[in-house]
Regions:
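Core subunits and conserved enzymes of cellular information-processing
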Residues: 5-488
Length: 488
């Protein structure tokens, strides 16, 4: 096993020696030091708020060489929400490189493509360092794609150093730098704040979209009507037009409905009784949540569909409209890309919600709705199944974990194979049902025009739920310090 990599059963494994090649680079990369003593809850809240403030400030800073007025934002709304990004700003790529690096490596380890014992502190440090290198590399790669493909328009009126090529290179460097800043900001929040910086940035982006969609008093089209739905409804009511006020509030109503359904689904679970084999009378319960794979499937499915849209735009601009042709607003107007693209939000549709209904309640509109829905739900189920099988969440892996902990299901032999057969009755079913459910819910939110998009709402509810749990745990540990020591 002295080779850097080897082949077993047609699978390529990377071992420690292969990753050790990157150790000199890992050693010189800046790292956020761990706190000398655990921060108090108050300090964690301060750090969290400071991180949020920096995130919002970065979203308002545009790179030198980019004219903010030329940036097209509308068609990238879903991408911004998923990646915690702001098109055209320093955080155009958002957390995309960080998330992609994490997903690639976790799937590689789970699928045994990388042979690495992460319980070993040295291996874990090496893995995290390599993940950081990959995230930095992806930051530059994505920045180059955004600039060279024309998604981020370069200001051609005053090229830097008199060269468009130099301007593009400088803009790409600034975009990559923005993602790297978010990478280290995430590291700061993980060690000094509450929860994960990545989750916080996504939730902040969705919350901002919800707030502006509901309460913005600025007109989107330059007219007298405010773009915020609440102000629109109030203006219609003042004019005696109650019906139009109802239509204006409809996306907000659907947002609340989707939010409540997700909150309810988060609490649905099956609890399997367990007992300790060596200690009779002591028992526990193993919860299998209905959303067993959380919102991971719909994130990956949405990312695939968004990449189809971006790839279609890139090919169309290159004179190869294989996936479809694109209109002046950089939105697909036909082809595969058109049918796999979410419908335009009622907020951006001429005539508001009534105009939106007039668009979708046609043969072409219905075909678009169901083609997009079928693709989103099918991909969600596929990714849900793949995620369970590749990340150690399948029946066999869970049964092995319970066996190592000395836990068994009462009334059955203490044999991992028996536990596996029992888990096989539940895990595959709830994986398919849960992944399909989040896909359908995201599709429903998209076609009804819910603010923040369906995927964004699903993400935010899950993130806020875990944020609340972390906050409550921190508060308990501060009140009872001995409990923290016992659990550690």
């Amino acid at each position: 096993m002295g080779k850097a990599f080897f082949v077993v059963s047609q699978r390529v494994f990377w071992d420690v020696s292969m990753l050790s090649v990157f150790k000199p680079v890992i050693d010189v990369l800046p790292e956020v030091g761990a706190p000398a003593r655990p921060p108090t809850l108050q300090k964690k809240l301060y750090w969290t708020l400071a991180g949020l403030l920096i995130f919002f400030i970065l979203g308002q800073i545009y790179p030198i060489g980019v004219n903010p007025l030329d940036v097209r934002v509308q068609q990238f709304q879903q991408l911004e929400i998923l990646l915690g990004s702001k098109m055209g700003s320093l955080i155009t790529s958002g957390i995309g490189p960080i998330v992609l690096a994490s997903i690639f490596l976790q799937l590689a380890v789970g699928a045994k493509l990388i042979s690495l014992d992460l319980s070993n502190p040295e291996n874990k440090k090496l893995f995290q360092g390599f993940q950081k290198i990959l995230a930095i590399g992806l930051s530059f790669l994505e920045a180059i794609i955004y600039v060279w493909s024309g998604y981020i328009p370069i200001d051609s009126t005053a090229p830097l150093f008199g060269s468009m090529l130099a301007t593009m290179a400088i803009v790409a460097f600034q975009l990559a730098l923005g993602s790297i800043i978010l990478l280290y900001l995430d590291e700061v929040l993980q060690k000094y704040g509450i929860g994960s910086g990545i989750s916080l940035f996504i939730a902040a982006g969705v919350a901002q979209a919800l707030f502006l969609g509901a309460f913005s008093f600025i007109s989107a089209s330059g007219g007298d009507m405010a773009s915020g739905l609440v102000f629109q409804a109030a203006q219609y009511v003042s004019e005696g037009n109650v019906a139009s006020a109802f239509w204006a509030l409809l996306p907000l109503i659907f947002t609340v409905i989707v939010f409540l359904v997700v909150v309810y689904a988060e609490g649905m679970r099956i609890e399997l009784p367990l007992s300790y084999g060596r200690a009779r009378g002591l028992g526990a319960r193993y919860p299998l949540k209905f959303l067993y794979v959380s919102n991971i499937p719909v994130i990956l499915a949405s990312a695939v569909l968004l990449n189809v849209q971006l790839m279609g735009m890139f090919l169309a601009h290159a004179g190869l409209p294989i996936l479809g042709n694109y209109g002046t607003g950089s939105s697909p107007i036909d082809g595969v890309a058109y049918y796999l693209t979410p419908l335009q939000s009622p907020l951006f549709t001429p005539g508001g919600y009534q105009g939106y209904l007039g668009t979708i309640l046609t043969t072409e509109g219905m075909l678009h709705i169901f083609a997009y829905g079928f693709a989103l739900v099918s991909l969600s189920v596929l990714f849900g199944w793949f995620w369970v099988e590749s990340t150690g969440m399948g029946p066999r892996q869970v049964a092995a974990q319970l066996g190592r902990a000395g836990l068994l299901i009462p009334g059955f032999r203490q044999d991992p194979r028996v536990t596996e057969k029992i888990l096989e009755r539940y895990i595959p079913v709830i994986t398919i049902l849960g992944a399909g459910f989040v896909g359908i819910l995201a599709w429903f939110a998209d076609i009804t025009g819910a603010l923040g998009t369906g995927t964004g709402i699903l993400l935010t509810v899950g993130i806020l739920y875990r944020f609340y749990e972390d906050l409550a745990k921190q508060q308990v540990f501060e009140q009872y310090p001995m409990l923290d020591k016992i659990l550690k």
